[in-house]
């Protein structure tokens, strides 16, 4: 037994070995944060759960687990065969003794990945209607205040202010500075727009933009949170991001898109000289129209003053007075007809009421009631007499069949010692005591002899 025990102690269980290896993996500092690139394989999206897939290159493959909380932070839709960058740690799945990569974050690989993210987000937001033409709002003709979201330094804000002041100096320009490049730019842009949204009643239009740059430089204007905030603004939005050849999702969500900051300022403001010239033309046309109207009205007034009506104004109401007299006569005749008709109806109703007078009806009902009461009384008396005769007859029949009546005629009946009526000699034996019941009393006797008689 001792030798067997010593042999067992040299061997590890499978669980012990897997646990030991897991500890080695988890304590290795080089395996706690690994930056990995590869191609997605066996990727099947599991809605609302953890994701299990593989990363591979042309020679090897490794299993990957990405828990739900980490996968929810992924900003694109992974697809089978897509090349990605993944960060995470390497450990073992102790229950199966296999090692796997636990992913914490995932990004598409390379510049092509940015275009893929752009395409996926554009398709998603388009389905929601964020770029629909029917949601586009017209720009105000004469804005009082214009909000601008861009970098505090640079040519963008300078070009906007110079152009706006030249075209329409009445408009007030307020800058809400924001970062327009880098990892924190999206949050900065959203924060600036939210400040404007909180004072939406003060501003007539919003300009958001920046100068040119690479796709990576312009990427904050493609972030979903920025695009959604542009769409949600309560005032019209002009987007001017990059050069004319650049198109961002922010441009698509805005109400208008301008190729340059200068073009954005021109769209937001009217050209004052042109406006003044147009106002002058409108003023001239208005004065001409007013003079023409006054002239026409003056001619009409002169004709009216010279008309015979103005010289003999009583003619205006002579015919009306005649019409009033005619209507009065018609009204009087109509009233007479109505009164006569209603009088006839009243007379007819009076006759009908007299014919159906309540006192006559009441008298008739009283007579009917008296007759019915007498009939009921006679019927009850007749039925009572019939019932009394039937009762007397039943009493007589009952008396005729009474045992006492039978005893009175000289008959008797016999009972045994227990009080049972004796109906047959089969109930008795010699020596039994019996009781004879007569009409005026009872007698007690004893059986001396029994003789049977057979009746045919």
Curated annotation (Swiss-Prot):
Superkingdom field: Bacteria
GO molecular function: exodeoxyribonuclease VII activity; nucleic acid binding
Primary residence: cytoplasm
TM region positions: none
Localization per record: Cytoplasm
CDD domains, sorted: ExoVII_LU_OBF
Class of enzymatic activity (EC top level): hydrolase
Assigned GO CC terms: cytoplasm; exodeoxyribonuclease VII complex
Family indicated by similarity: Belongs to the XseA family.
Physiological role: Bidirectionally degrades single-stranded DNA into large acid-insoluble oligonucleotides, which are then degraded further into small acid-soluble oligonucleotides.
Name assigned to this protein: Exodeoxyribonuclease 7 large subunit
Organism in which the protein naturally occurs: Lactobacillus delbrueckii subsp. bulgaricus (strain ATCC BAA-365 / Lb-18)
